[in-house]
Each structure stands twice: as C-alpha cells, then as structure tokens.
Amino acid sequence: MDRKHLANAIRALSMDGVQKANSGHPGAPMGMADIAEVLWRGHLNHNPSNPEWADRDRFVLSNGHGSMLIYSLLHLSGYELSIDDLKNFRQLHSKTPGHPEYGYAPGIETTTGPLGQGITNAVGMAMAEKALAAQFNKEGHDIVDHFTYVFMGDGCLMEGISHEACSLAGTLGLGKLIAFWDDNGISIDGHVEGWFSDDTPKRFEAYGWHVIPAVDGHNAEAINAAIEAAKADPRPTLICTKTIIGFGSPNKSGSHDCHGAPLGAEEIAATRKELGWEHGPFEIPQEVYAEWSAKEAGAAKEAAWNEKFAAYEAAYPELAAEFKRRVNGELPAQWEEKANQIIADLQANPANIASRKASQNALEAFGKMLPEFMGGSADLAPSNLTMWSGSKSLEASDFSGNYIHYGVREFGMTAIMNGIALHGGFVPYGATFLMFMEYARNAMRMAALMKVQNIQVYTHDSIGLGEDGPTHQPVEQIASLRLTPNMSTWRPCDQVESAVAWKLAIERKDGPSALIFSRQNLAQQERTAEQVADIAKGGYILKDSDGKPELILIATGSEVELAVKAAEQLTAEGKKVRVVSMPATDAFDKQDAAYRESVLPSDVTARIAIEAGITDFWYKYVGFDGRIIGMTTFGESAPADQLFEMFGFTVENVVNTAKELLA
C-alpha cells in the first residue's frame, strides 16, 4: 500500500478529531504525518499489548499541542484507544485530553504541552536508558537497549529549557536520543523569521550533536535514511525535517491559519479530495488498519526480549532480580525496619547541625540501601551537600555512576528528572537553593500533575542564609510549593525530622517532594518514640503544657527552636503553652479530623505561627484571631543573626506577641 495513503490516515483522523471537538491543532499532525509513518511503522520497537514493556523505545511528542498525531498513531497501531476515544478528543473524562497526559491513554510516555519540556523529559529518558544499560548489561546480554525519539517544533527550540537540556545531552553523549525538528517556519503569530532566525543546525552542532540538515519531511525514503544514519551515530541526533504545516489542506497549509483552529467543514472536504482520501469522518478501511497494526510485530519483539532476559536471569540471577525490583519501583527488602532504625539512632544521638548537613547524612545512610538513587545538583553540590561517599559522577564515557552534574540548569535539571522517573529504574533527586526553584517551578508542577517521583533538595531556605541578600533569600517560595496540588513539602527542624522527610520522599511514588533545608545549624529537639512516629503525620505536639493549653505556638524548620525557647519562658511565667512542630502542612492536612483536633484543639484560639517565610499562608492554622511572626517584605543583605532580630524572630518578640494575644 502507498505510504502516503497510510500517512493520510493520520491526517484524516487529526482534522476530524479537531473538527469534532471544535478546538485543537490540526497543522502539526498533518505536517508530521509522513515522518510519523516512517518512524512508527519502520523503526519504533513497541508492543501495543504491553505499553509497560521495559525495553520499549520511548516516543515523546514535545510539541504536545499536536496531540491528535499521537492519539492517531496509538489508535492505528493497536493500543487500547478506540475510535470513540478519538471522537471524544478534548472532552471531559476522555482518554484524549487536549494535550497528551501521562496516565490517560496507554502509550503516552509523558505529559507535554508546556513547550520545551518534552524534549527535556526525553533527555532524562535517554540518560536513564544509558545509565541502566551501564549498570545492568553484561557481555552478550544487552537487556537495556532502546532509543528515545522526540518530535519537536519551533516553539520547543525557542524555549530556553531546550538549550539547557540539549547542551547537556551533547556533553553526555546520549547517542540513543533522536530528535526530529518540525521545521515548518510557522508559529501562532505567523511566519517565524521575524522572531526566530537562529541557525538551528549550527546551534546543535555546537552542542556536540550529530545533525542531519534539510531532510524533506514528506519524502519517506529521505526520512528513513536519516533515521538509519541517526541510529548508527554515537552522538545524539537532530534530524531537521522541512515540512508544510497542515499538509494537504489546499487553502490553509503553510500558514498559521491551520496551527490552532479547526479547518472547517468545507476545507476538510477539500483536503480529503486533495489527499485522495475517500472515506468519511473517523472512517479507516480495514486494509489500512492491517498495515498499521503493530500488535503482532510488537508481541514478537517483546517475546524475543523475554528470551534474552531469561538467559540473563540464568547467568546473573541476583542482577536480574535487582533489575526487576528497580523497574517495578519496589524498595529493597527490610527497607522499612532499617530506615526506622536509622531514624531512632539519630534521635538517640543528638547533633546540632544544619538541616542541609542532616540531609547529607540521611543520603549517606539511605544511599547504601538504594542503588537506584540518581542524584544531582544544579552546580551547587558543595552547598546543597548532595554528594555522599557512594556518589559517582556520570560521564559520557562511563554511565555506571549515580550522580549527575547538571550545571547551572535548574529548569532543565527538574524536567530531566521527570524523564528519569518516567523511564523507570531510578529514584531521582536534584538540588538547588530554595530561591532558584523559581527557575524550575513549571517542571515541578508537571511532576505533581503527572504523579511522578521527583525529589528536590532546596537548601538555604530563608533570610538565614544572610549576607547574599534578598536575591538569594526565599520569602514566598515555601508557601507557593505548599499551594501546588499533589506536592509534598517538608521543612524539617533538625536531623531527625530531616531523615523522616527523606524516608517519606523515597517511599512516595505518586508525586514530587520538596525537601527544604537550612544553611545554619539547628538544635536537635527531644522526643519520645511516639513523637518520632508522629513526625510522619506532618504536624505533632513537640512540647506540651500541664493540662489544657491556653496558647499554641506552631513553627517549622529553623523557627521550632525559637518556639520552644519562647514556650519555656512563657511557661516559667505561669502560662500554659503547647508547641506544635509542623514540618509538612500537606501531610498534616491529610490526617483525620480527630488527630488534627488533638494537635490543634478548636477551642484554643490563641495561636501564633512562626516561620521565616511569607505570613499569609498560616491564617488557615491560626485563624483571624491568631498572630503570625513571619516575612511581609523581601530580606536584606546582612549577617543572619542580625536579620532574624530585625525581622522579629526573637524569643522576646514571640513572648511579647503571646502576651498581647492572651491579654
């Protein structure tokens, strides 16, 4: 059957889906249909009957607005995505949302739409493939051996994150990464030469990529030859495909008119005629389905891999068991009891250290049990303290390590980590100063949206970092992280809470965790075994009064010590004061009503929250009658102790505020 005819099935489904939804983007799917046909029918190793097959090739549609392209491909190839699912494009509770979303349609490897993040996730997937291969493959046993393919448009390349990711991909020599640039010269505003005149091939050559320029994106032979050349090269490859947006539309192709709106009934009829597609809306002939189906070939490919894995298992039983455990995302045997023992030992051996140092100690203790750790930092390892004795850096020539030097690329780092998590086999953690999570915010939001594990270590968490001043002092960042749905945010007060936060982040497979640590030393608090167990609840009674409290002090992180000292003074003066440490408000909010009431009794309305961050967040815990000692402005450049005094983080101020409140 004519290959153009098979590609036209994508074009027909794409324009029909967008038309029925009365919204969407037909241009990119119609322009990239020929490339997709060659890649998916000739090269992509996948099994529609098992989208989770560990050694499948990964395909990422970075220009996610062209989602009807991937939905059409999944449907035609034989995934569980019906023609009715395609008719439900962009409708409530459908498997085909406006942008591809991980966890909806089978075969969607990542959520894309925010441009540039798909290619960055793909870099993470390719890094995971290369690292897993280095850790598990043995001579004659290549059980990890797959490619990561990406489609991306001009918008992805204009986004700064594409520079961060593609630069690192070149440095690390990710030869199994193959990207197709949909060079159609059109964006929403029109022809891109007015705002995007980069020499893209030279840009990627400068990154150390293999670049194949000027490929006719509508010529199957040229596309196929480019893919063959890409697969044979040890460098990551950019295939520059010249395409016509909206290919086949007589009056709208080649213009921004077909980028982000339905073609309209008349134009669709004219396009069908132009393409020689004689079938009605959403109608695909059986013989076209037969040519497209990847079920038989995919099952055979997976069966062949299963045979390879059985031979590997016979030769290396322990490694094979470990591979299965890691790919399934399971924690090692006895994880729970060993981790709890580590935490108990910390409580029994007090240390007044910075929580960033406590974090490093937790990495040291837990890292020995977790070969799946893949750490990193955005060029701040000596400050974030993210390296431990078992850390080994990844290098282009040796990927057997477990630590990535991301360079100063916070956004790239975080989105790469999403790709590593999506690929499987690793528990990724990365780090920067809390202030610079701002650069990475959208990638953390994507982790929360996709429900993937992404552990961020954010150090230097307040005005407590001192002299570097307000450019580096976070104020509103902690609150903004807490406000993000499905984000777990921890601000521990000492080494014990820090270790608990790490343990829970490692166990949390259905969303990201932000672990927030101090630069300055923090005093360790006394606790019973029951109190240690209650840390996991996110908020607990750390110090209590004799009898019912008349005042509750709620604090996090570096301010817990302050709350305890103020409570001691108030208690000495005859006041009944309870101190609540609340390292994770999201965890506390998930506790049942009885527990929350036991910690914060509703009839005790005299409450003060103390945190060196924005004040507004805390009203939900102290009420309108309560008080908040926090930040209402940006910080200043000065030694930390002077700043804490200036902004009211003193025992004297807490005591005076309490007396005013109780009066």
UniProtKB/Swiss-Prot annotation:
The active site is at residue 410. Homodimer. Substrate binds at residues 25, 259, 356, 383, 460, 468, 519. It is an enzyme of class 2 (transferase). Catalyzes the transfer of a two-carbon ketol group from a ketose donor to an aldose acceptor, via a covalent intermediate with the cofactor thiamine pyrophosphate. PANTHER family: TRANSKETOLASE, TRANSKETOLASE 1-RELATED. Mg(2+) binds at residues 154, 184, 186. It comes from the Bacteria. Belongs to the transketolase family. This is Transketolase 2. One of its GO terms (biological process) is pentose-phosphate shunt. Its cofactor is Mg(2+); Ca(2+); Mn(2+); Co(2+). Its EC number is 2.2.1.1. The record marks 25, 259 as: Important for catalytic activity. Thiamine diphosphate binds at residues 65, 113-115, 155, 184, 259, 436. InterPro entries: THDP-binding, Transketo_C/PFOR_II, Transketolase-like_C_2, Transketolase-like_Pyr-bd, Transketolase_bac-like, Transketolase_BS, Transketolase_CS, Transketolase_fam. Binds 1 Mg(2+) ion per subunit. Can also utilize other divalent metal cations, such as Ca(2+), Mn(2+) and Co(2+). Binds 1 thiamine pyrophosphate per subunit. Gene3D superfamilies: 3.40.50.920, 3.40.50.970. One of its GO terms (molecular function) is transketolase activity. It catalyses: D-sedoheptulose 7-phosphate + D-glyceraldehyde 3-phosphate = aldehydo-D-ribose 5-phosphate + D-xylulose 5-phosphate. GO terms for cellular component: cytosol. Signal peptide: none annotated.
